Structure formats: structure tokens, C-alpha cells
Regions:
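Conserved pre-ATP/AMP-binding loop-to-beta segment of ANL
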Residues: 62-64, 184-186, 196-227, 234, ...
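Structured binding elements
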Residues: 126
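Conserved AMP-binding/adenylate-forming core of the ANL superfamily
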Residues: 48, 62, 66-120, 137-142, ...
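N-lobe entry segment of adenylate-forming
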Residues: 1-78, 82-85, 89-92, 176-178, ...
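ANL superfamily adenylate-forming
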Residues: 72, 155-219
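Conserved S/T- and glycine-rich ATP-binding loop of Class I adenylate-forming
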Residues: 105, 122, 222, 228-231, ...
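Hydrophobic, small-residue-rich alpha-helical packing segments that form membrane-like cores
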Residues: 110-111, 140, 154, 221, ...
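Conserved ATP-dependent adenylate/AMP-binding module captured primarily in the ANL superfamily
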Residues: 119, 136-177, 248-262
Length: 262
């Protein structure tokens, strides 16, 4: 495989890419004019569609897709069918808030199942998410919100580490002070009364039907933005795209981590 990837990189990566669903097949695998390179030209797809719907259509609706182990030891399993249902519900809610293709959504949440739903639902409708580590403070969060030109913030109110609660709400509230963006709160500590432009995560999830469908986007359409730590200056946003990330990540998981269907 390694030799094949060197001798015929376009044939090699094209074969891996064709394992996925393409709403519109790509016409060319790679266009490389230094320093720019573009993958799967002309193709349209959606990474979340391929992660969920494609597997449901393959007969894996009742197979466990996500296993979540909480801080308190609680375990929760979601099948592909259950996960798709929740993603569609949340995606419907996000669309009703005016979030759509190309919009940036910053996610400032603890390591929870709901955080995964937020990422999947955002990408499902062609929006671009940027996860900010819940250990970062006010200035770091605000800087990333501004740089990404976020339209929406999805934030947790509290995070738990080694059994102790860490207040996220006050950090998030200070970070968005005077900024014109909507906020969805994942509330665990207590259910606060929310002002205009602020919404409850669970109400957005369970208060909407699973009617959203995947937004098919260009292979080079941004999937998410991942910021560097900013230890040597302003944080730099690394952009990953639907086509390349979907194909590259699958290849690495199957080849180097030996992940199999079962």
C-alpha cells in the first residue's frame, strides 16, 4: 500500500475516496500548485452523512455507533439510528436559529455526548464548528469567537474534573459581552432563565423533529477550524475540509489503528 501511494497517489487516494457517498462524483483527485493543493475537485459530499446515514443505509441502524463514559462512571450507548435521529433534531433546531451553510459555530463545552452532537449537527447542515477547550479562559475564548466570526456559541454551564465542578457559564458570558451572537446553553448545574437570543440545548434538541437532511457541500468546504494554543502569539486557525478529512481520517484509523467494521 505504501509503495502504491507513492507510485500512483491519485489512484491510491481516489480508490479510498470512492468508498464514500458522493452526491456529485469528483472529477479529479488532486490539483497541486505550490503552496496550494485541492482534493477531489468537483465532488460534493458531507462527512456526517457518510458517518451516519451511509451506515444506516448499509444495515447498521442498530449497531452501536457511540459509547460515552461520563465523569461519574455513567455509561451511555447510541446506535447509528439513535445518533442520526438526535443529530437531525439538533440540526433542525440550529437551522431554525438561522444557522446554515458556511456559518461558524464555536463550541465551548465539557467532554460530553452533547458536545459530540453539537459537532455532528453543525457539520450536517454545512456550518463550520470550532471547538474551544473548556479549560481556556475569557480572553482565549473571546479571541477565537472573534477570529472565526462566529454566528453562534454553544456553551456548557459547568464542567466536572475529578469530581469538582468548574464554572464555564461566567467565562462564556464575559467572553461574549457586547458581541452580537446567539448562544445555546447546555445546562447541567441548574436551568437558568434565558434572555432573548439565548436558548436551552435540550429544548433545541428534543423540541424539534428529526426533519433536517444533510447539506451536500463541495469537497473543499470547511468542516471545522482548530486553533493552535497561541503560545507564541495570536492563535492560528487550521481549517479541515469535508472531503480530505473524511478520507484521510478513515484511512489512518483503518490502517494504523486497525479499526474494523465489527
Amino acid at each position: 500500500e505504501y509503495r502504491k501511494s507513492l507510485e500512483d497517489p491519485e489512484g491510491f487516494w481516489g480508490a479510498w475516496a470512492r468508498r464514500f457517498h458522493w452526491e456529485k462524483p469528483f472529477e479529479k483527485v488532486l490539483e497541486w500548485t505550490l503552496p496550494e493543493h485541492r482534493w477531489f475537485l468537483g465532488g460534493t459530499t458531507n462527512a456526517v452523512y457518510n458517518a451516519l446515514e451511509r451506515n444506516v443505509e448499509r444495515g447498521l441502524r442498530n449497531k452501536v455507533a457511540l459509547l460515552y463514559l461520563a465523569e461519574d462512571g455513567r455509561e451511555e450507548k447510541l446506535t447509528y439510528g439513535e445518533l442520526l435521529d438526535r443529530v437531525r433534531r439538533l440540526a433542525t433546531g440550529l437551522r431554525r436559529l438561522g444557522v446554515g451553510k458556511g456559518d461558524r459555530v464555536v463550541i465551548y463545552m465539557p467532554l460530553t455526548l452533547e458536545g459530540v452532537l453539537a459537532m455532528l449537527a453543525t457539520a450536517y447542515i454545512g456550518a463550520i464548528h470550532s471547538v474551544v477547550y473548556a479549560g481556556l479562559g475569557v480572553s482565549a475564548l473571546r479571541e477565537r469567537i472573534l477570529d472565526a466570526q462566529a454566528k453562534l456559541l454553544i456553551a456548557g454551564d459547568v464542567s466536572f474534573r475529578r469530581g469538582k465542578g468548574v464554572d464555564l457559564r461566567s467565562i462564556a458570558e464575559e467572553a461574549i459581552r457586547d458581541l452580537p451572537l446567539k448562544v445555546v446553553w447546555f445546562q447541567r448545574a441548574y436551568k437558568a432563565e434565558l434572555s432573548e437570543g439565548h436558548y436551552d440545548f435540550h429544548e433545541l434538541l428534543w423540541g424539534n423533529p428529526p426533519e433536517a437532511r444533510a447539506e451536500m457541500v463541495d469537497a473543499e468546504h470547511p468542516l471545522f477550524i482548530l486553533y493552535t494554543s497561541g503560545s507564541t502569539g495570536k492563535p492560528k486557525g487550521v481549517v479541515h475540509v469535508h472531503g480530505g478529512y473524511m478520507v484521510g481520517t478513515t484511512y489512518h484509523l483503518r490502517t494504523f489503528f486497525d479499526v474494523k467494521d465489527e
